[in-house]
């Protein structure tokens, strides 16, 4: 099994959720994140004063998938999250040793 983690632009969340649902994903975790990549933040002007915003708001999406499905789901996320601008995000895949559904005790693929 794999844990797919994506950091995306907040305005792309609905597109990513819709695309993953169409790909057969029945569950995911979404959380707010702040960070920066190559863009290293930006500068804003408020009431005449200039401020450096070095942590940019992002959304973290996590999906657990079978090994065979991981590549397709990564492509699905990348396609849905792409706006063609700097800061679109990153997707990474990590090995997952086990998954257990708390309610039933099911493990492995049955718990996804």
Residue ranges of predicted features:
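Positively charged, small/polar-rich N-terminal and surface patches that mediate targeting and assembly
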Residues: 1-112
């Amino acid at each position: 099994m794999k844990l797919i983690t994506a950091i995306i632009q907040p305005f792309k969340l609905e597109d990513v959720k819709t695309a993953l649902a169409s790909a057969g994903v029945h569950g995911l975790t979404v959380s707010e994140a702040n960070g920066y990549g190559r863009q290293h933040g930006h500068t804003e002007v408020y009431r005449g004063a200039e401020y450096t915003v070095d942590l940019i708001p992002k959304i973290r999406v996590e999906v657990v998938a079978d090994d065979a499905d991981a590549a397709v789901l990564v492509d699905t996320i990348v396609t849905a999250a792409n706006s063609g601008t700097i800061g679109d995000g990153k997707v990474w895949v990590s090995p997952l040793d086990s998954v257990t559904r708390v309610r039933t005790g099911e493990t492995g693929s049955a718990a996804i």
